[in-house]
């Protein structure tokens, strides 16, 4: 049995086992589908460099992981940092934002161990019709399938 990617999925890197794991993860997270990447770094870089478009706005916590920062840097979207876990500052920025708004946070911040206020973030995202993107890399496993699933908030997020 092959382990890991043997190349790009288009050419030779897709396998039945990969698709089984994706189906399993989608089921466990109660979402329509899941997509595996070779690492969390490539997942964040790929997402933020390709999904938000010119005219959109990405609002990211100032303590967000480097992989998100790198993906955001490659994006054509407008980029704004908000103070760490400061929901009032985030709301002030959302009021002035344009296009589709993406709020980027980590559920468990890798550098200092802080938790994102996920319930408050879901309410703010709903209020401003924003898309909340949660990096669960440091919570997955330690908190089961992550804090989003543990708090039963998975239907309010685009990416985990």
Identify the residue ranges that each predicted region occupies.
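Conserved PLP-anchoring active-site segment centered on the Schiff-base-forming lysine
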Residues: 47-66
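Short, structured coil segments at secondary-structure junctions
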Residues: 54, 74-76, 128, 156
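Active-site phosphate-binding strand-loop segment of PLP-dependent enzymes
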Residues: 80, 84-134
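Short, small-residue-enriched loops and turns at beta-alpha junctions
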Residues: 10-14, 66, 87-88, 108-112, ...
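Conserved active-site segment immediately N-terminal to the catalytic lysine
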Residues: 129, 148-160
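SF2 helicase catalytic motif II
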Residues: 130-144
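Conserved N-terminal alpha-helix of the aminotransferase class I/II PLP-enzyme fold
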Residues: 2-39
């Amino acid at each position: 049995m092959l382990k890991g990617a043997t190349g790009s999925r288009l050419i030779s890197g897709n396998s039945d086992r990969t698709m089984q794991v994706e189906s399993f993860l989608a089921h466990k997270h109660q979402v329509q589908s899941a997509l595996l990447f070779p690492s969390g770094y490539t997942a964040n870089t790929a997402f933020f460099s390709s999904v938000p478009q010119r005219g959109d706005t990405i609002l990211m916590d100032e303590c967000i992981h480097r992989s998100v920062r790198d993906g955001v840097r490659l994006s054509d979207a407008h980029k704004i940092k908000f103070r760490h876990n400061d929901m009032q500052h985030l709301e002030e920025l959302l009021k002035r934002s344009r296009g589709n708004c993406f709020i980027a946070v980590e559920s468990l911040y890798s550098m200092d161990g802080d938790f994102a206020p996920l319930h408050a973030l879901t309410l703010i995202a709903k209020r401003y019709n924003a898309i909340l993107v949660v990096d669960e890399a440091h919570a997955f496993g330690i908190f089961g399938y992550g804090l989003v699933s543990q708090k039963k908030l998975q239907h309010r997020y685009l990416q985990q």
